[in-house]
Amino acid sequence: MSSPVTAQRPPAAPPLIAVDAMGGDHAPREIVAGAVRAVREHGLRLALVGRSSELAPLVAAEQAARELPIVHAEEALAMHEGALAAWRRARSSVAVGCKLVRQGTAAALVSAGSTGGVVSTATVRLRTLPGVLRPALALVLPTTPTPTILLDAGANADAKPEMLVQFAHLGAAYARVGHGIAEPRVGILTIGSEPGKGNKLARRAAELLSANATEDRLDFRGNIEGHDLLAGLVDVVVTDGFTGNVALKSVEGAVRFAFDEIRAALTSSPLARFGTLFQRRALRELRTRFDSETYGGAVLLGLNGTVVIAHGASRAEGIAHACLLAHNLVVGRITDQIRRGIAGVSRTPSWLHRLSAPEE
């Protein structure tokens, strides 16, 4: 889940966004349809990356040949492919999209493909920014009044305390650029709100964040428990990718269960169905707020380029919003913000820079 995306005014010459047209459960048809919506409804400039023989007829059917150029890529990542795809699929649509970003032809990449495959391919081909140990997958939870950013949501199953400190700065930069939060509050996800709670990783990361909060210009608020993820107590929640992904899936499952129970209760009797008529608008707004189709997706932070990973089940609306999110981050110069933020906090042991690529 993540926060609804709103459009910023496009510049005179919108940045080009490369869209992986072969990634996702409903590729390429829904990807093409979403790209068309992004171009026509939001004025974005996109290029589809994938097998031209499959994409050209779909683009022609949308009468969008002049609006959506196609960059041919021979291969596509399967949804089950993980980290090894970065080496096995050198000619995949994700790899070609990363090449466009690296060359400066495109400003960002959007993909609904396998998260593991996209993360590993982007990390290998774009490389991390100077001083960044590992990229982190960041998404936003639909809290009020402002969204809460959760990272890492699955890019790194294992992490070191120094990595979590960097994740805090990556998330803070995203909060400022993507959501207009001037002074993001940062917390670390653990098993108790009191100082000193949690495993060695959480405790050491909290110590580092507390000790350097003033010098690093970071508003660290301490520990956050799982039941407070949606409470809006902080703007950025930091954890390792294993814990973050479990927390995310737990929240998604709980929300799905709650909506199923609400639906069952509202249709349990004629009187209940009648009462639903008076709550239809509020229920629709609530569902939209938690529906991944109305959100942009997760952002892979810390690379030499902007990468947005949409939900694998995204249809046209979800893809359009992912493209809009990528556009807004490029316009907000998210990469430069992260580069400046990390430059002042890269006080980490040199051996950490030799950590292996993200796990599957």
From Swiss-Prot:
SUPFAM superfamilies, per database record: Isocitrate/Isopropylmalate dehydrogenase-like
Q: Which top-level enzyme class is recorded in the Swiss-Prot or TrEMBL entry?
A: transferase
Q: Which InterPro entries match?
A: FA_synthesis (IPR003664), Phospholipid_synth_PlsX-like (IPR012281)
Question: Pfam family of this protein, just one?
Answer: FA_synthesis
The alphabetized UniProt keywords are: Cytoplasm, Lipid biosynthesis, Lipid metabolism, Phospholipid biosynthesis, Phospholipid metabolism, Transferase
Name the Gene Ontology biological process terms.
fatty acid biosynthetic process; phospholipid biosynthetic process
Q: Which NCBIfam families match?
A: plsX (TIGR00182)
- Give the protein name, as stated in the record: Phosphate acyltransferase
- The species is Thermobifida fusca (strain YX)
Q: What is the lineage of its organism?
A: Bacteria, Bacillati, Actinomycetota, Actinomycetes, Streptosporangiales
